[in-house]
Amino acid sequence: MKKLLKISISIILILGICFLLFEISKSRNFQFFGGHVNKAETEEKVAALTFDDGPGVNTEEILDILREEEIKATFYLTGQEIEQHMDDAKRIAGEGHEIGNHSYSHTRMVLKSPSFIKDEIEKTDDLIRQTGYEGEIHFRPPYGKKLFFLPYYLSKHERKTILWNVEPESHPEIEGDANKITEHVAENIEPGSIILLHVMYESREESLKSVKKIISSLKEQGYHMTTVSELLKHQK
């Protein structure tokens, strides 16, 4: 009986630890090593519009929208898609937008070896430089997942993990409607917010449609939209 009790307690502890690590891996407020940012601590009405993945089929359209609205944004691109769409990536850089590293293969970087993480980041850094982009390269983990080795690598290289605090597409009842996406952003925006959208693929048509609406809505609220690097300059 005592042996069975010990086994049961051990199983419960293991499951508890696994659950805790899972929650930590997706947390936007905690990581084991280094710095992370999900918003800038400021009272100024500034916010960053960020796009994950790509370059993809909608790159030209989103760039046309941003140019028309005179907005600079941050694009977290994957290495594989930069290789496939180098001309689009070069246009992103050429039009003065910020490019961040979103890994090479868009694999969850949890329970991966240090060598895998190093290769994913450094290969993509090299590809980003090939676009002509000369600014600081921030890193955003795929799916926002990080645990031990990724934060440790970034901290050793004095790089922060860039996350977000406004993500309308995470709500199934919102993601398929451009107006609802816009409303969610307008209702949840605050000084220093980092907004996450996915607009690069055909399946994200409603997200793409929401971009102009979001920009217009935030301008009406008195917000200035900028890149993540510029946003961080407003930190208290």
Per-region residue spans from a language model:
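N-terminal Lys/Arg-rich, disordered targeting/topogenic segments
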Residues: M1-L4
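Active-site beta->alpha N-cap acidic-glycine motif
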Residues: R28-K112, F116, E120-L127, G135-E136, ...
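Short beta-strands and strand-loop turn motifs
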Residues: N101-S103, L163-E167, I194-V199
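Domain-start "cap" segments at the beginnings of catalytic or binding domains
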Residues: D125-W164
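His/Asp/Glu-enriched short active-site or ligand-binding loop at hydrolase and phosphoryl-transfer sites
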Residues: P151-E187, Y223-H234
